[in-house]
Amino acid sequence: MMSRKTLSKACLLSYLLLVRVANSGDLAGDVGIGTTGLGLHASILLETDINARFGVNYMKLSTIMHDTDGDTNVDATLNTLDALLDWFPHKNSFHLTGGLVYNGNKIDTVTKLNGMTYKGTTYSMPLGTSLGEVDGKFNVGNIISPYIGIGWGNVLTHTTGWGLTSDIGLLFHGKPQITLSSNGCTAGPACVALIAKVANEEARLNDEYAGKIVYPVARIGASYKF
């Protein structure tokens, strides 16, 4: 285990390195918003036409969907960590970008059932019973997702101060993994039908989304060069 003294030295060296890079004019940061949520990135000059960019993006979105079977609470979480290289082939603000992204994007749903129809049969709940709820989870197939894209804005070419950045690209998250489960059903025979319906719906959704392996990325932001 790393000692507190060793950790303190590592933090101090990292801080001194960042200060040195910042003083050399080879460090810039940007904040932005887009389909990956709110983002914060830092760019470091590697070569005259190549920047390394590291960042974090996060946003949580919630909504309620209404259906005849019940109301569904939907919670979507955008959570990614970027490790990217920006290449400027024409010595201007246009750049090609590639890299790897830790992809923690996910969707969680909870449907509180107030009724159910399955294969033409409408099930009624005896007094004091309940269909419970159906929990759903949507997770990406690749926790480490490749990214390719283009963009405009070189945060390290202008003088100290503010600038603009933008990105358009594709995040290859792989085949999504969708799971559904029923919980808390006490409605007797209706529970058996519910389990079958949930299993069929899970298979249908996984089949429907099997080919949707990319996530579109579009971002715009403001940068600051130190």
List each model region and its residues:
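Residues on the lipid-exposed face of transmembrane beta-strands in outer-membrane beta-barrel proteins
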Residues: 40-44, 83-87, 98-100, 148-154, ...
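Outer-envelope beta-barrel architecture signal
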Residues: 23-27, 38, 48-52, 92-94, ...
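Outer-membrane beta-barrel strand-turn architecture
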Residues: 46-50, 89-91, 154-158, 226
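Long, hydrophobic N-terminal alpha-helical segment
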Residues: 26-67, 71-88
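Cleavable N-terminal export/targeting peptides
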Residues: 1-25, 211, 226
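Transmembrane beta-strands of outer-membrane beta-barrel pores
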Residues: 33-37, 56-62, 100-106, 154, ...
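A eukaryotic "domain-to-IDR transition" signal
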Residues: 94-99, 112-114
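Extracellular/periplasm-exposed beta-strand and loop segments of Gram-negative cell-envelope proteins
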Residues: 56-83, 105-145, 174-217
